[in-house]
Regions:
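Compact soluble domain cores
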Residues: 18-38
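Amphipathic alpha-helical interface surfaces
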Residues: 6, 22, 26, 58-61, ...
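Alpha-helix C-capping/helix-to-loop hinge sites
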Residues: 13, 17, 33, 84-87
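Arg/Lys-rich, positively charged N-terminal/basic patches that mediate binding to nucleic acids
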Residues: 1-22, 106
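Basic/aromatic recognition patch in beta-strand/loop cores that engages polyanionic ligands
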Residues: 36-80, 85
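Sequence/structural signature of beta-propeller domains
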Residues: 9, 25, 32, 45, ...
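Enriched for short, Lys/Arg-rich terminal
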Residues: 68-110
Length: 110
């Protein structure tokens, strides 16, 4: 069974941006195919999933930043934001995400 870990930042954003049923659907989709979404260059292996929210319109989707480790089969949800807030992480945010990826690798041995 795949283990899912959520950062406090992710949980706060999910509570603000997603209904519980949409959050569950999103998380199940990523857990089922974690390697499906593109890697974000310069982040040490984090990925970005795009997800459409019901009734959100063209700019109403969200982006999930996550890290997947095959062994020990962990998906770590690092961040979530609305598309209308930003399209991609800034250079500074990518540097921070790279640090997060390194910490996850140290913690879980990936």
């Amino acid at each position: 069974m795949r283990r899912v870990i959520r950062s406090s930042r992710y949980e706060r954003a999910a509570a603000r941006l997603l209904r519980p049923s949409v959050q569950q659907e999103l998380e199940e989709s990523i857990a089922a195919e974690p390697e499906r979404h593109p890697l974000i260059p310069g982040t040490g292996g984090l990925r970005k999933a795009r997800w459409r929210r019901p009734g959100g319109g063209k700019s109403g989707g969200v982006r999930v930043i996550y890290y997947f480790m095959l062994r020990p089969d962990v998906v770590f949800r690092a961040d979530l934001y609305a598309k209308n807030e930003k399209e991609n992480p800034t250079h500074a945010e990518r540097n921070q995400l790279q640090k997060i990826a390194s910490e996850i690798q140290r913690e879980f041995g990936g």
